[in-house]
């Protein structure tokens, strides 16, 4: 099983405390997959919604593939369906309702020639938690610099 990372959402790790991750497939068109292979995709502003026991990703920006004739009405930031088992969707729904969590996209990657999206159940960090993260990172950098 070979995994090839395409995009990682670095802001997600800074702004949220990640509790649990899930691997989901995405429903895509042919030209979109070509664009993703060229790394012409962004998940920084993307978010995940659950509607009628189905999971969708919104605002995932997949640029138009330059060599493809595009279908009318196909937008770069259209709503795309995520593929998960029903049991996983029900688990996610229950955890969101009980613990007041959100679902965020963490990374996009290829796994055996299929595009997969790693989504995470996360809790938003407060401002003071973010400051502590920055202080911790700075001290680790200083220690590493002094070590060299």
From Swiss-Prot:
GO terms for biological process: trans-translation. One of its GO terms (molecular function) is RNA binding. The keyword Cytoplasm applies. Signal peptide: none annotated. InterPro entries: SmpB, SsrA-bd_prot, SsrA-bd_prot_CS. Keywords: Cytoplasm, RNA-binding. GO terms for cellular component: cytosol. It is found in: Cytoplasm. Belongs to the SmpB family. Required for rescue of stalled ribosomes mediated by trans-translation. Binds to transfer-messenger RNA (tmRNA), required for stable association of tmRNA with ribosomes. tmRNA and SmpB together mimic tRNA shape, replacing the anticodon stem-loop with SmpB. tmRNA is encoded by the ssrA gene; the 2 termini fold to resemble tRNA(Ala) and it encodes a 'tag peptide', a short internal open reading frame. During trans-translation Ala-aminoacylated tmRNA acts like a tRNA, entering the A-site of stalled ribosomes, displacing the stalled mRNA. HAMAP family: SmpB. This is SsrA-binding protein. It comes from Mycoplasma mycoides subsp. mycoides SC (strain CCUG 32753 / NCTC 10114 / PG1). The gene is smpB.
